[in-house]
From Swiss-Prot:
This is Small ribosomal subunit protein eS1y. It holds the Pfam family Ribosomal_S3Ae. It comes from Vitis vinifera (Grape). Residues 1-18 have a biased composition (Basic residues). Belongs to the eukaryotic ribosomal protein eS1 family.
């Protein structure tokens, strides 16, 4: 009878089972600091791997983008439908200093606005602030019934939609070109631009639910620590 290895009998491994390494052991927590335009400054924490050789922890944090609800930043649930994007610009000790990097609506808010018997009007424009930020602003609006109107529908004509869109672009450009990024964000929070559009277009067709729906930063100026410190009031 041939004598060979019995594969069913397993040998014990040398050294026993290897202990699993804790993934958080080589990482550090940093505090995220929001700009001074918002009511709440400490908005959360973020993880990053510790400095090892040429790999510096602070460099791994720079340009990281955080998405935070405006309700948390303003301590007001009425702003829960807005999402604010903040980008890490610099690291001071254990604090990550951020700056505004965009804005968006939550999907549920956007869907709740769309209804039957009305016209949805959208416009977008590229604008430049006084501190050389290039932004793309998206505006959304809905038509509403005129006073004493019995008709169920409130549809705007194509010529009226074009006029409203032109007015939207004009107002967005004027508002952004006359101020810096910090002042512009201050206008977004109470929806000042939306109210101005609603007022300016009332003679063309009455509008409701006029919002700056989305803001994207296309181009930012060269990094300036002094301006960042001023924005964060540090």
């Amino acid at each position: 009878m041939a004598v060979g290895k019995n594969k069913r009998i397993s040998k014990g491994k040398k050294g026993g089972k290897k202990k699993a390494a804790d993934p958080f052991a080589k990482k550090d927590w940093y505090d995220i600091k929001a700009p001074s335009i918002f009511s709440v400054r400490n908005v959360g924490k973020t993880l990053v791997s510790r400095t090892q050789g040429t790999k510096i922890a602070s460099e791994g944090l720079k340009h990281r983008v955080f998405e935070i609800s405006l309700a948390d930043l303003q301590n007001d649930e009425d702003h829960a439908y807005r999402k604010i994007r903040l980008r890490a610009e610099d690291v001071q000790g254990k604090n990550v200093l951020t700056n505004f990097w965009g804005m968006d609506f939550t999907t549920d808010k956007l869907r709740s606005l769309v209804r039957k018997w009305q016209t949805l009007i959208e416009a977008h424009v590229d604008v430049k602030t006084t501190d050389n930020y290039t932004l793309r602003m998206f505006c959304i609006a809905f038509t509403k019934k005129r006073q004493n109107q019995n008709k169920k529908t409130s549809y705007a004509q194509s010529s009226q939609i074009r006029q409203i869109r032109r007015k939207m672009r004009e107002i967005m450009t004027t508002q952004a070109a006359s101020c810096d990024l910090k002042e512009l964000v201050r206008k977004f929070i109470p929806e000042m631009i939306g109210r101005e559009i609603e007022k300016a277009t009332s003679s063309i067709y009455p509008l409701q639910n006029v919002f700056i729906r989305k803001v994207k930063i296309l181009k930012a100026p060269k990094f300036d620590l002094g301006k960042l410190m001023e924005a964060c009031s540090w």
